[in-house]
Amino acid sequence: MSIIELKGVTKEYGQGHTLVQALKPTDFQLEAGQFVAIIGPSGSGKTTFLTLLGHLQTPSKGQILLHGKDTSQLKEKERAALRFNDFGFILQASNLIPFLKIEDQFQLIDRLSKKERTNLDSLIELLDLKGTLKQYPKELSGGERQRAAIARALYNSPDIILADEPTASLD
């Protein structure tokens, strides 16, 4: 069984005559352990595709199955739980919580997650973040913020990691 599957998924923005199809009907399957790169020119729908995969948006049409279950009828609270437990997001602009110190970003995951997590000390060492833990995101360089965002995305041991230009701002 696929970890995630899209069946005839489309995404449209606007209304009436100003309707823009950002993603044409798309079928896609991702199996456990599989790595996939989505490439294409600017404006081709790559980010829209990733936000649909990660349940950050709902499709205009089609079905998204996660672990074989249709997620199209989930309420926002259930979708948020899916995002937290099943996905790690690494976005072009770091998605760290601005009012939490870096160490608190990880402690928040500790409090909210019931999953076994990746060893934080290993991530901190691997991504050279030891000196950043007591700082707020705004106090870090762009590269430090991006490395902290990568560590946070990996820390909850997600089934699926979605990265949209993850090397942006890395030093």
Tell me the role of every PLM-derived stretch.
Residues 18-20, 71-88:
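ABC ATPase NBD coupling module
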Residues 54:
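Helix-to-loop junction immediately C-terminal to a conserved catalytic motif
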Residues 161-164:
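Catalytic Walker B motif of ABC-type/P-loop ATPase nucleotide-binding domains
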